[in-house]
UniProtKB/Swiss-Prot annotation:
GO terms for molecular function: amidase activity. The gene is amdA. Pfam families: Amidase (PF01425). The keyword Thylakoid does not apply. It catalyses: a monocarboxylic acid amide + H2O = a monocarboxylate + NH4(+). The keyword Hydrolase applies. PROSITE patterns: AMIDASES. Its EC number is 3.5.1.4. It comes from Rhodococcus erythropolis (Arthrobacter picolinophilus). Keywords: Hydrolase. Belongs to the amidase family. This is Amidase.
Length: 521
């Protein structure tokens, strides 16, 4: 198997890229030298074809009609049976469409990925099937997952089941909408800047971003290796804990995971007494320029209601919370341009299981369909290219060197408190924008809500969004964040609040005025 050889034009372009001057002699000599070096590429290609290429898998799937997909939340539907019985037997799960399901088409919300069918199941898919779950389909996500709203998918906007003229949130908007609408029992979401917690908050469901590295990212399309997370989106905290118990733990294929990572016990203490736990309300998480006062008030009321069951609730200042967003922004922008775009998703320089078929497919379409990318991805491309080339990646290096300081600021507060609380989002779901909205408004509406969620992607702390109440008839999320690998306490506090609050209504119950009464907010 012969690797494609560069022609003279390609060699000239490579030389210009690196500032290398090619004289007449060099132009004659380099093709043969490069050809010799590419001999190893030929050997690797043949070895991979013989020894490591995954077998082709065929699984039935369907593209649902508009009437079958009123929220535009399904990319394709399936009915993949479990591989064994387990704790999830009889439960239906949707998989975010940046996560590979062998034999089922994948789009990742983007024309640049459209047409790809993976040959491997992601680790989380394998584990869900082994635990008895049925995979009901792939849920629509944002274009390359770089949006906190739900209007950038190439397949069209995902609609909020509470009000179909409003955003469902992103980038896991399809996952949250399907859970909220009762189409599935739970879903897999991904989170690089809040993309599990944002749609969970907008749609009135539970979303948990686990501690970084707790759940293997193997088989999901990356954005930036140091902020990639997968986690559960569910109706209840109990189901989030149950799902986490299935998908957590080291798989040996993900460089994001330390060798010591083990799944915890998230269920045995879930309903334990929370009397005496200390809750810190982070002042810097409130009063953003775009914050709705009613949302801030609802979350403060929800947090203070925990005193009714014995928790101590106090306010705390963490000034680094306001800096952490900017640290995240540099890492996500430069790192996203370097790995997600120039690195065709996976990048290099790390061990782990790669998906070379997906890398090659994306590389073949990334430039061809660049104009079809969302404005948010174009912002990453243009800003990140400047950061990498003109600034030499130094800003990325500075941001990475600041991460330990931001992490330490939260850790200091978490020595005083068991968990930290703030609004997941500064406002309730807004109306979907018009198709001809100007570029600046497009980007602001897509990314303007992530100030509280993004910091914990870069610091890696576990962070849970639970419904705190309703403002103007729309859900509000309260975010509960804890110590690294203490996901159990985060979920325990969320569960205690859930029981105190009472069952959160579904959109259908709210519409029929049969919703249960909520205690706080």
């Amino acid at each position: 198997m012969a690797t494609i050889r560069p022609d003279d034009k390609a060699i000239d372009a490579a030389a210009r890229h690196y500032g290398i001057t090619l004289d007449k002699t060099a132009r004659l000599e380099w093709p043969a030298l490069i050809d010799g070096a590419l001999g190893s590429y030929d050997v690797v290609d043949q070895l991979y074809a013989d020894e490591a290429t995954p077998p082709t898998t065929s699984r039935e799937h369907a593209v649902p009609s508009a009437s079958e997909n009123p929220l535009s939340a399904w990319y394709v539907t399936t009915s993949i049976p479990p591989t064994s019985d387990g704790v999830l037997t009889g439960r239906r799960v949707a998989i975010k469409d940046n996560v590979t399901v062998a034999g089922v088409p994948m789009m990742n919300g983007s024309r640049t990925v459209e047409g790809f069918t993976p040959s491997r199941d992601a680790t989380v898919v394998t584990r869900l099937l082994a635990a008895g779950a049925t995979v009901a389909g792939k849920a629509v996500c944002e274009d390359l997952c770089f949006s906190g709203s739900s209007f950038t998918p190439a397949s069209g906007p995902v609609r909020n089941p509470w009000d179909r003229q409003r955003e469902a949130g992103g980038s896991s908007g399809g996952s949250a909408a399907l859970v909220a609408n009762g189409d599935v029992d739970f879903a897999i979401g991904g989170d690089q800047g809040g993309s599990i917690r944002i749609p969970a908050a907008f749609c009135g469901v539970v979303g948990h971003k686990p501690t970084f590295g707790l759940v293997p990212y193997t088989g999901a399309f990356p954005i930036e290796r140091t902020i990639d997370h997968l986690g559960p989106i569910t109706r209840t905290v109990h189901d989030a804990a149950l799902m986490l118990s299935v998908i957590a733990g080291r798989d040996g294929n993900d460089p994001r995971q330390a060798d010591s990572v083990e799944a915890g016990d998230y269920l045995s203490t879930l309903d334990s007494d929370v009397d005496g736990l200390r809750i810190g309300i982070v002042r810097e998480g409130f009063g953003h320029a775009v914050s709705q006062p009613e949302v801030d008030d609802a979350v403060r009321a929800a947090a203070h209601s925990l005193t009714e069951i014995g928790c101590t609730v106090e306010e705390v200042n963490i000034p680094w919370h306001l800096h952490a967003f900017h640290i995240w922004n540099v890492i996500a922008t430069d790192g996203g341009a370097y790995q997600m775009l120039d690195g065709n998703g996976y990048g290099m320089n790390a061990e782990g299981l790669y998906d070379p078929e997906l890398m090659a497919h994306f590389a073949s379409r990334r430039i061809q369909h660049a104009d079809a990318l969302s404005e948010t991805v174009k912002l990453v491309a243009l800003t990140g290219h400047h950061g990498i080339t003109t600034l030499g990646g130094a800003s990325y290096g500075k941001a990475r060197n600041l991460v330990p300081l931001a992490r330490a600021a939260y850790d200091t507060a978490l020595r005083q408190f068991d968990v930290l609380v703030m609004p997941t989002l500064p406002y309730v779901a807004s109306e979907l924008p018009a198709k001809d909205v100007d570029r600046a408004t497009f980007i602001t509406k897509a990314l303007g809500m992530i100030a509280n969620t993004a910091p914990f992607d870069v610091t890696g702390h576990p962070s849970l969004s639970v419904p705190a109440g309703l403002v103007n008839g729309l859900p509000v999320g309260m975010m509960i964040t804890g110590r690294h690998f203490d996901d159990a306490t985060v979920l325990r506090v969320g569960r205690a609040f859930e029981k105190l609050r009472g069952a959160f209504p579904t959109p259908a119950e709210r519409a029929s005025n049969s919703a249960p009464q909520l205690s706080p907010a």
